């Protein structure tokens, strides 16, 4: 179990990337310093993902 203190931590680390891969969506930065960049993750409400018009 690599550097984990218990089996629960090891199990969570193993499934985390799978959850993001299967359930995740991509969001693109449309303004600010990271304009054009992309992040992939699991969002609570992906249909209303947005930020202030001035960017993030």
Curated annotation (Swiss-Prot):
Keywords: Capsid protein, Virion. This is Tail attachment protein. Its main location: virion. It is found in: Virion. Gene3D superfamilies: Phage tail proteins (2.40.10.180). Is needed for attachment of the tail to the head. GO terms for cellular component: viral capsid.
């Amino acid at each position: 179990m690599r550097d984990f203190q218990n089996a629960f931590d090891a199990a969570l680390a193993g499934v985390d990337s799978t959850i993001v891969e299967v359930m995740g969506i991509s969001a693109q930065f449309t303004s600010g310093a990271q304009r054009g960049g992309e992040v992939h993750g699991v969002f609570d409400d992906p249909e209303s993902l947005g930020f202030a018009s001035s960017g993030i």
